[in-house]
């Protein structure tokens, strides 16, 4: 991704043996260091007893799924709890079978049950799993002015459920637009009026980031605490979720320990001090996309890829001179290690490390018969360098692009396409050449997700970067105020979410592994770029999030 320089604005600085005038940014240093390597002995191994208990509890949950009556509120709540506790990956077939039955046997528009909470929960679960169910059923809860009906004004759980459901709307579903606005306003006022601390926390979390945009592990960590406080919770499910969370966390800690060794050997903090040093943050990013144990190889490689992409961004955005970047881009374009001798030392150091990452990718993918995918991954990294170079040329020539010119380049420089294709290249799921060609063609779901990434990135970094962004260019072209520009760009983000939602509904535009990758990457963007750039400045919110899911057990 293109990571905004939020810590300090760019400034001219004379550095280097040849007294070359370069830009610089006062990034904060790495805040984790070798923590995960130094504390390896404290990260306990998973015992045989834990594995046995985990397996027994998993079978008990499967029995619960079978025994609970179909389409009852209890069945729907059970599925919702399993998903929000972060353990649905153990029960994908069972949940899919149940929801297909619910969809086929109990069409939402034919139900006689008028309970808002159940209607909204059923609607959300079906939409989450790609079923295109109509939203007309909610019209009786919204009046002509778009306000909530008086009859449900005090049904807080129902309103909260409708709020979550309305976040799965697509363009043209006005009833869901009205429901989202009305529910949001109602819930915001509730926070100050209620004395129920648990309900207040639940509402605050939902308004901050709804379920549709929540990272599984972060959401699970928070929901485990809320679920524990719920008097009606299932003790076996709670115990299973806590055990599973801690077991997976230990796996992640072990992976980070090995990645920290790789990071220490690179020693970019000393060799390339101009770049952001964010290994653990990069792992957090990738873990937000693929947290399940089976994606161990993907997490290892993709953490290295995104770390290298971050340094690549800073090379173009902060440190390289135009002459250096011309040569550098040429070498990346050719992907030829023999051509690096003409480059400055810092660029040679970087490119050797970059090429090594892709050699490792080729070796790992060769083991599972997926070597063909690596070429797609390389091509996207080359393309990322090309668009970074285009932006650097704009900077050095002081050229102000039009909004159209900017977005054409900036959608790619957001890094979304590069990371999506590199991710699909290294997961074990079989992604065919035909599917790769489809993804590379930038279909609607990728375009929408790239728009979300780029605009949220620009909105978060506005005012802290010494370069043009969508905010600057929109204000200039339309002659509007900063507030008006923000309002319009946020509207574009909102509409892009609706387009993305549509592409995830049956008939789906792509296979589940592709859609899951696309959706999860967009969720990471929401977490890191809502209101601030929490990657560039990872000392506060990001540090707390990482600590909650990678350091502290539940």
Swiss-Prot record:
Induction: Induced by drought. Mn(2+) 1 binds at residues 313, 317. It catalyses: (2E,6E)-farnesyl diphosphate = (-)-(E)-beta-caryophyllene + diphosphate; (2E,6E)-farnesyl diphosphate = alpha-humulene + diphosphate. Mn(2+) 3 binds at residues 457, 465. GO terms for biological process: diterpenoid biosynthetic process; response to water deprivation. Involved in the biosynthesis of phenolic sesquiterpenes natural products. Sesquiterpene synthase converting (2E,6E)-farnesyl diphosphate (FPP) to (E)-beta-caryophyllene and alpha-humulene. This is (E)-beta-caryophyllene synthase.
């Amino acid at each position: 991704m293109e990571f905004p320089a939020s810590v300090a604005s760019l400034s001219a600085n004379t550095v280097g043996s040849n007294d070359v005038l370069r830009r610089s940014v006062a990034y904060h240093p790495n805040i984790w260091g070798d923590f995960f390597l130094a504390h390896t002995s404290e990260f306990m191994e998973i015992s045989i007893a834990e594995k046995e208990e985990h397996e027994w509890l998993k079978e008990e949950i499967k029995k619960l799924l079978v025994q609970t009556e179909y389409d009852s509120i209890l069945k729907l709540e059970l599925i919702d709890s399993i998903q929000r506790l972060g353990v649905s990956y153990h029960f994908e077939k069972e949940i899919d079978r149940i929801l297909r039955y619910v969809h086929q046997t109990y069409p939402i528009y034919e139900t006689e049950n008028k309970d808002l909470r159940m209607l909204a929960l059923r609607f959300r679960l079906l939409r989450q799993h790609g079923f295109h169910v109509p939203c007309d059923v909610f019209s009786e809860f919204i009046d002509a002015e778009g306000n909530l009906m008086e009859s449900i004004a005090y049904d807080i759980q129902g309103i909260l459920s409708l709020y979550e459901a309305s976040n799965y709307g697509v363009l043209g579903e006005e009833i869901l637009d009205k429901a989202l606005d009305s529910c949001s306003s109602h819930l915001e006022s509730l926070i100050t009026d209620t004395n129920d601390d648990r309900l207040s926390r639940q509402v605050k979390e939902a308004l901050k980031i709804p379920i549709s945009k929540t990272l599984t592990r972060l959401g699970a960590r928070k929901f485990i605490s809320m679920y524990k406080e719920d008097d009606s919770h299932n003790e076996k499910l709670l115990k299973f979720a806590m055990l599973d969370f801690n077991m997976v966390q230990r796996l992640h800690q072990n992976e980070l320990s090995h990645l920290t060794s790789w990071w220490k050997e690179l020693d970019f903090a000393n060799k390339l001090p101009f770049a952001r040093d964010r290994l653990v943050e990069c792992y957090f990013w990738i873990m937000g996309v693929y947290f399940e144990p089976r994606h161990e190889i993907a997490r290892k490689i993709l953490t290295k890829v995104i770390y290298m992409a971050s340094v690549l961004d800073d090379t173009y955005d902060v440190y390289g001179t135009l002459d250096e970047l011309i040569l550098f881009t040429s070498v990346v374009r050719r992907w030829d290690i023999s051509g690096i001798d003409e480059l400055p030392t810092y660029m040679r150091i970087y490119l050797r490390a970059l090429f090594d990452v892709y050699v490792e990718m080729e070796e790992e993918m060769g083991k599972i018969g997926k070597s063909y995918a690596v070429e797609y991954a390389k091509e996207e990294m080359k393309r990322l360098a090309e668009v970074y170079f285009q932006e650097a040329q704009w900077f050095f020539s002081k050229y102000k692009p039009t909004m159209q010119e900017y977005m054409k380049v900036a959608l790619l420089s957001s890094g979304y396409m590069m990371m999506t294709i590199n991710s699909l290249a290294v997961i074990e799921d079989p992604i065919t050449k035909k599917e790769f060609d489809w993804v590379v063609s930038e279909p609607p779901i990728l375009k929408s997700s790239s728009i979300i990434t780029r605009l949220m990135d620009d909105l978060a970094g506005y005012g802290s970067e010494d370069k043009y962004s969508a905010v600057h260019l929109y204000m200039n072209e339309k002659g509007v105020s900063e507030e008006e520009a923000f309002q319009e760009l946020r509207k574009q983000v909102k509409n892009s979410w609706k387009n993305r939602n549509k592409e995830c509904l049956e008939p789906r535009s792509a296979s589940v592994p592709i859609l899951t990758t696309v959706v999860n990457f967009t969720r990471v963007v929401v977490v890191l770029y809502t209101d601030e750039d929490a990657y560039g400045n990872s000392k506060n919110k990001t540090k707390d999030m990482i600590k909650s899911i990678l350091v502290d057990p539940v």
